[in-house]
Protein backbone atom coordinates (compact mmCIF):
# COMPACT_ATOMS: atom_id res chain seq x y z
CA UNK A 1 0.00 0.00 0.00
CA UNK A 2 1.46 3.34 -0.97
CA UNK A 3 2.11 6.10 1.55
CA UNK A 4 0.16 9.26 2.17
CA UNK A 5 -1.10 10.79 -1.08
CA UNK A 6 0.26 14.23 -0.14
CA UNK A 7 3.87 13.12 0.37
CA UNK A 8 4.89 13.31 -3.29
CA UNK A 9 3.60 16.85 -3.69
CA UNK A 10 5.06 18.02 -0.36
CA UNK A 11 8.48 16.83 -1.49
CA UNK A 12 8.46 19.02 -4.60
CA UNK A 13 10.03 22.48 -4.67
CA UNK A 14 7.47 25.26 -4.72
CA UNK A 15 7.56 28.03 -7.31
CA UNK A 16 6.45 30.50 -4.65
CA UNK A 17 8.27 32.41 -1.97
CA UNK A 18 5.09 33.94 -0.56
CA UNK A 19 1.69 33.21 -2.08
CA UNK A 20 0.16 36.04 -0.06
CA UNK A 21 1.60 38.53 -2.54
CA UNK A 22 -1.10 37.43 -5.00
CA UNK A 23 -4.01 37.55 -2.57
CA UNK A 24 -6.60 40.26 -3.29
CA UNK A 25 -6.38 41.39 0.36
CA UNK A 26 -2.57 41.65 0.35
CA UNK A 27 -1.28 44.97 1.69
CA UNK A 28 2.15 45.78 0.20
CA UNK A 29 4.68 47.99 1.95
CA UNK A 30 4.76 50.28 -1.10
CA UNK A 31 1.97 51.52 -3.35
CA UNK A 32 3.39 52.47 -6.75
CA UNK A 33 1.44 54.95 -8.89
CA UNK A 34 -0.69 56.11 -5.95
CA UNK A 35 1.75 58.59 -4.41
CA UNK A 36 -0.54 61.58 -5.02
CA UNK A 37 -3.54 59.89 -3.42
CA UNK A 38 -1.47 58.76 -0.42
CA UNK A 39 -0.14 62.29 0.03
CA UNK A 40 -3.64 63.80 -0.10
CA UNK A 41 -4.86 61.45 2.63
CA UNK A 42 -1.79 62.06 4.77
CA UNK A 43 -2.06 65.85 4.55
CA UNK A 44 -5.63 65.67 5.84
CA UNK A 45 -5.25 62.92 8.45
CA UNK A 46 -2.10 64.36 10.03
CA UNK A 47 -4.43 66.60 12.04
CA UNK A 48 -5.41 63.51 14.07
CA UNK A 49 -1.84 63.29 15.40
CA UNK A 50 -2.25 66.78 16.83
CA UNK A 51 -5.59 65.94 18.44
CA UNK A 52 -7.59 67.86 15.83
CA UNK A 53 -10.44 66.65 13.64
CA UNK A 54 -9.46 65.75 10.07
CA UNK A 55 -11.90 66.83 7.39
CA UNK A 56 -14.43 64.25 6.27
CA UNK A 57 -13.42 62.76 2.92
CA UNK A 58 -14.92 60.98 -0.06
CA UNK A 59 -12.75 58.74 -2.22
CA UNK A 60 -14.06 57.92 -5.69
CA UNK A 61 -12.92 55.52 -8.36
CA UNK A 62 -13.79 52.44 -10.36
CA UNK A 63 -13.35 49.03 -8.67
CA UNK A 64 -9.70 47.98 -8.59
CA UNK A 65 -8.30 51.52 -8.60
CA UNK A 66 -6.68 51.16 -5.18
CA UNK A 67 -9.08 53.12 -2.95
CA UNK A 68 -9.35 50.55 -0.18
CA UNK A 69 -5.74 49.40 -0.13
CA UNK A 70 -4.46 52.99 -0.10
CA UNK A 71 -6.80 53.87 2.77
CA UNK A 72 -5.71 50.82 4.78
CA UNK A 73 -2.05 51.60 4.15
CA UNK A 74 -2.36 55.22 5.28
CA UNK A 75 -4.45 54.37 8.36
CA UNK A 76 -1.99 51.66 9.38
CA UNK A 77 0.82 54.23 9.24
CA UNK A 78 -1.36 56.72 11.13
CA UNK A 79 -2.06 54.28 13.97
CA UNK A 80 1.63 53.38 14.15
CA UNK A 81 2.64 57.04 14.43
CA UNK A 82 -0.11 57.67 16.97
CA UNK A 83 1.26 54.94 19.23
CA UNK A 84 4.75 56.37 18.86
CA UNK A 85 3.52 59.85 19.84
CA UNK A 86 1.15 58.69 22.58
CA UNK A 87 -1.81 60.07 20.62
CA UNK A 88 -5.00 57.99 20.62
CA UNK A 89 -6.14 57.28 17.06
CA UNK A 90 -8.82 54.62 16.54
CA UNK A 91 -9.93 53.47 13.10
CA UNK A 92 -12.92 51.42 11.98
CA UNK A 93 -13.32 49.93 8.51
CA UNK A 94 -16.82 48.83 7.54
CA UNK A 95 -17.67 47.25 4.20
CA UNK A 96 -21.15 48.52 3.46
CA UNK A 97 -21.85 45.73 1.00
CA UNK A 98 -21.75 43.29 3.91
CA UNK A 99 -22.75 45.58 6.78
CA UNK A 100 -25.54 47.32 4.92
CA UNK A 101 -28.01 48.81 7.41
CA UNK A 102 -27.84 51.77 9.77
CA UNK A 103 -28.27 49.49 12.78
CA UNK A 104 -25.54 47.06 11.76
CA UNK A 105 -23.04 49.85 11.05
CA UNK A 106 -23.43 51.51 14.46
CA UNK A 107 -23.61 48.10 16.19
CA UNK A 108 -20.29 47.15 14.57
CA UNK A 109 -18.64 50.38 15.73
CA UNK A 110 -20.06 50.03 19.26
CA UNK A 111 -18.78 46.45 19.47
CA UNK A 112 -15.27 47.46 18.37
CA UNK A 113 -15.28 50.13 21.09
CA UNK A 114 -16.35 47.70 23.83
CA UNK A 115 -14.16 47.25 26.88
CA UNK A 116 -14.20 44.63 29.61
CA UNK A 117 -17.46 44.86 31.56
CA UNK A 118 -19.45 46.61 28.82
CA UNK A 119 -22.83 45.15 27.97
CA UNK A 120 -22.73 43.57 24.49
CA UNK A 121 -24.76 45.34 21.83
CA UNK A 122 -26.98 42.71 20.15
CA UNK A 123 -27.11 42.23 16.38
CA UNK A 124 -30.79 43.19 16.51
CA UNK A 125 -33.30 44.31 19.08
CA UNK A 126 -32.18 47.69 20.37
CA UNK A 127 -33.51 50.99 19.03
CA UNK A 128 -30.89 52.39 16.65
CA UNK A 129 -30.73 55.63 18.65
CA UNK A 130 -29.75 53.64 21.74
CA UNK A 131 -26.89 51.99 19.84
CA UNK A 132 -25.77 55.39 18.55
CA UNK A 133 -25.80 56.74 22.12
CA UNK A 134 -23.60 53.80 23.09
CA UNK A 135 -21.15 54.71 20.32
CA UNK A 136 -21.02 58.32 21.55
CA UNK A 137 -20.50 57.24 25.16
CA UNK A 138 -17.71 54.78 24.31
CA UNK A 139 -15.94 57.16 21.93
CA UNK A 140 -15.99 59.88 24.58
CA UNK A 141 -14.59 57.44 27.13
CA UNK A 142 -11.69 56.48 24.85
CA UNK A 143 -11.01 60.06 23.77
CA UNK A 144 -8.61 60.90 20.98
CA UNK A 145 -9.59 60.84 17.32
CA UNK A 146 -11.81 58.20 15.73
CA UNK A 147 -11.81 57.64 11.97
CA UNK A 148 -14.69 55.67 10.46
CA UNK A 149 -14.17 54.24 6.97
CA UNK A 150 -17.35 53.34 5.09
CA UNK A 151 -16.25 51.26 2.11
CA UNK A 152 -18.80 51.05 -0.73
CA UNK A 153 -20.84 53.68 1.08
CA UNK A 154 -22.98 54.16 -2.04
CA UNK A 155 -24.41 50.68 -1.46
CA UNK A 156 -25.52 51.67 2.04
CA UNK A 157 -27.21 54.85 0.82
CA UNK A 158 -28.89 53.13 -2.13
CA UNK A 159 -30.39 50.60 0.24
CA UNK A 160 -31.30 52.70 3.26
CA UNK A 161 -30.96 56.41 2.49
CA UNK A 162 -28.58 58.92 4.04
CA UNK A 163 -29.91 59.08 7.62
CA UNK A 164 -26.87 57.24 8.95
CA UNK A 165 -24.46 59.60 7.21
CA UNK A 166 -26.28 62.55 8.74
CA UNK A 167 -25.99 60.94 12.18
CA UNK A 168 -22.31 60.07 11.82
CA UNK A 169 -21.33 63.47 10.48
CA UNK A 170 -23.10 64.99 13.51
CA UNK A 171 -21.19 62.95 16.09
CA UNK A 172 -18.76 65.75 16.96
CA UNK A 173 -21.63 67.83 18.33
CA UNK A 174 -22.37 65.03 20.82
CA UNK A 175 -18.91 63.77 21.78
CA UNK A 176 -17.19 64.81 24.98
CA UNK A 177 -13.45 64.16 24.81
CA UNK A 178 -13.37 62.26 21.52
CA UNK A 179 -13.42 63.53 17.97
CA UNK A 180 -14.64 61.74 14.84
CA UNK A 181 -13.93 61.90 11.10
CA UNK A 182 -15.59 59.98 8.26
CA UNK A 183 -13.99 58.56 5.11
CA UNK A 184 -16.48 57.37 2.51
CA UNK A 185 -15.31 55.16 -0.36
CA UNK A 186 -17.52 54.95 -3.45
CA UNK A 187 -17.39 53.37 -6.89
CA UNK A 188 -19.95 55.94 -8.09
CA UNK A 189 -18.56 59.34 -9.08
CA UNK A 190 -22.07 60.81 -8.92
CA UNK A 191 -22.82 59.38 -5.49
CA UNK A 192 -23.31 62.73 -3.72
CA UNK A 193 -26.05 63.76 -6.15
CA UNK A 194 -28.33 61.34 -4.29
CA UNK A 195 -27.59 62.86 -0.87
CA UNK A 196 -29.41 65.54 1.07
CA UNK A 197 -27.39 68.77 0.53
CA UNK A 198 -26.72 69.01 4.28
CA UNK A 199 -25.21 65.53 4.30
CA UNK A 200 -23.26 66.10 1.10
CA UNK A 201 -21.66 69.30 2.38
CA UNK A 202 -20.61 67.64 5.64
CA UNK A 203 -19.33 64.41 4.13
CA UNK A 204 -17.64 65.75 1.03
CA UNK A 205 -15.30 68.28 2.67
CA UNK A 206 -12.36 66.84 0.73
CA UNK A 207 -12.59 64.58 -2.33
CA UNK A 208 -9.99 62.35 -3.97
CA UNK A 209 -10.60 60.75 -7.36
CA UNK A 210 -8.67 57.54 -8.07
CA UNK A 211 -8.16 57.24 -11.80
CA UNK A 212 -7.94 53.72 -13.28
CA UNK A 213 -4.47 52.23 -13.60
CA UNK A 214 -3.09 52.33 -17.14
CA UNK A 215 -1.51 49.26 -18.74
CA UNK A 216 2.09 50.17 -17.90
CA UNK A 217 1.18 50.82 -14.26
CA UNK A 218 -0.54 47.43 -14.00
CA UNK A 219 2.54 45.84 -15.52
CA UNK A 220 4.76 47.51 -12.91
CA UNK A 221 2.50 46.42 -10.05
CA UNK A 222 2.35 42.82 -11.26
CA UNK A 223 6.12 42.81 -11.67
CA UNK A 224 6.59 43.90 -8.05
CA UNK A 225 4.13 41.27 -6.82
CA UNK A 226 5.92 38.60 -8.84
CA UNK A 227 9.29 39.57 -7.37
CA UNK A 228 7.82 39.30 -3.86
CA UNK A 229 5.90 36.08 -4.37
CA UNK A 230 7.77 33.94 -6.92
CA UNK A 231 11.27 32.50 -6.71
CA UNK A 232 13.94 34.26 -8.74
CA UNK A 233 14.45 32.80 -12.20
CA UNK A 234 11.02 31.19 -12.47
CA UNK A 235 9.67 33.84 -14.86
Model-derived segments and spans:
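Mid-core helix/loop region of P-loop NTP-binding domains shared across ATPases and GTPases
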Residues: 2-6, 10-14, 18, 23, ...
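Dynamic helix-loop-helix/coil hinge segments at AAA+ ATPase domain boundaries and subdomain interfaces
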Residues: 20-39
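Short, charged/polar micro-motifs that form catalytic or ligand-binding hotspots
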Residues: 27-31, 60-65, 95-96, 154-158
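Pre-Walker A adenine-sensing motif
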Residues: 39-50
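Walker A/P-loop nucleotide-binding motif
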Residues: 53-75
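Conserved catalytic segments around the Walker B and adjacent sensor/switch elements
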Residues: 56-58, 81-98
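Active-site catalytic microenvironments for nucleophilic, acid-base chemistry
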Residues: 77, 81, 112
Amino acid sequence: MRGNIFEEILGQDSLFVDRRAFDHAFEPARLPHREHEVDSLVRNLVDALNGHIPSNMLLYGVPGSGKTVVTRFVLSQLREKGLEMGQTVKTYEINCRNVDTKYRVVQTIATQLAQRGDAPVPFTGWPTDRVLETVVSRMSRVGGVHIIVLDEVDNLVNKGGDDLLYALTSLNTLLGDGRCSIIGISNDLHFTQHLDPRVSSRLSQEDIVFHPYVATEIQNILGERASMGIKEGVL
